[in-house]
Amino acid sequence: MKLFLVLGLIIVSSYAERRFPDDFMFGTATASYQIEGGWDADGKGENIWDHMTHTKPHAIKDMSNGDEAADSYNNYKRDVEMMRELGLDAYRFSLSWARILPDGLGNNVNKAGIAFYNNYIDEMLKYNITPMVTLYHWDLPQKLQDLGGFINPLFPEWFEDYARIVYEHFGDRVKHWITFNEPREICYLGYGGNIYAPALNVTDIGTYYCAKSLVLAHARAYYVYVNDFKRSQGGICGITISVNWMEALTDSEEDEQAAEIYRQAEWGLYAEPIFSEHGGFPKEFSEIVAQKSFEQGYPRSRMPEFTDEERKFVQGAYDFFGVNHYTSYLISAKSYKEEHPIPSVYADADVGNYVPPEWPQSASDWLTLAPNSINNSLTFLMKKYNSPIFYITENGWSSPPDAGLLDDDRIEYYRAALNSVLDAIEAGVNLKGYMAWSLMDNFEWSNGYTQLFGLYQVDFKSPEKTRTPKKSAFVYKEIIKSRVIDPSYEPTTLEMWIDEGH
């Protein structure tokens, strides 16, 4: 075991002297289905999470849904007030495709949906809060899913049409665009697995065919912006990929190679086509999948190839790399292997992962406080992909519903994470901002309301969905204001206020 992994947990008080750049963008993040509610309000169409939670409620741990969630559809002004309380520079949120285009297609634009997001964006800008907008955060219109969703070869065209409508309506004010949030979770958990909607569980090809369709759709939405809107609107467009760090368990060549294969399977499928110099799917992993496919009797690889034209089209389709980061895993070529469906993406990777028991555990079984995790990920990506601009678009910590307002574990996590951010900046990573997940407690997908990530507690039982700041909100507010991480800072009150200028 590598000694630095344990030593890295120690946070030295001298870190408090290091400053974030004055132009570093601090914010928080949310997603439409997780907070908005109003699932059928004012002409909104059904999306895949509406459909799954209504027809298969047992798919959610507590049998809940996002029908009301935090009711941001009616409470968006309170949400912006919370942003002002924290002193945020930016707020990352997603648009509900079905709220804008109820049927998913471009022929029927819902004016009420457009008005809602106009009001939301204008309320932020009134207080100098920069909107960072995600086009797709997992809530596909159900009509498009009925037609095959991401697997339909027309999907990139549908997404391009949607993106164009969004740019036309909001691009005069929105200057930071993200096409997709977390392709791995979309493709593996929704198509290759049965954890997230649409829960197709097509383990052999679902992940791979979804991945190709998604990156093609991303490129089409990117080039629509570049060719038709960028000159007049002056914004930037990227994609957000979940990049947790994969470290070799030992210094052996076998474990180092296993860690690299796991990185390719986890996020390389989505990053390599866009950010690498060669384009296309990761070479080593695609060769593994092809070999196993032939051994399993498939007439061709279960991972589709890009044509030369497609590869060149996708390659370089970005202005920045959005990184959602939460934790790390130690990867072994032989030990700690779990059973996976055969064939599937993780059976193809065929590696084991280990989490040391001394790493602090959150309410989510997959989320621990791993040492210097953000720095490890970002410096690796910087070297691999020729120093793109980065934003941390999600990073956060989960608590159980009864955790209360004194969330010292979340504070410990954020301080460690932000120290790792400073390490990355000092290492030369071109990191422009950090979005904490999340502004408020919300519907946590298949876990319902059993795992909560908010800086603000939400009383989901109250008609008003009352928001109350947790202790971590005050600590994050102080970091934003001072631009330093003071490990000894303790808020003197849990009564929130808005500073002058916000």
Residue positions per predicted region:
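A common structural microfeature
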Residues: V6, D23-M25, Y73, A90
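Active-site mouth loops of central-metabolism enzymes
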Residues: K61-N75
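Alpha-helical scaffolding within the catalytic cores
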Residues: N75-D79, N376-S377
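Short secondary-structure capping/turn segments at boundaries of alpha-helices and beta-strands
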Residues: Y15, D79-V80
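Short, well-structured secondary-structure segments
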Residues: D89-S96, T130-T134
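Active-site region of glycoside hydrolase catalytic domains
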Residues: E17-I60, R84, D103-L105, K111-H502
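Beta-strand-rich binding-surface signature
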Residues: V80, R92, I121
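Cleavable N-terminal signal peptides of Sec/SRP-targeted secreted and luminal proteins
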Residues: M1-A16
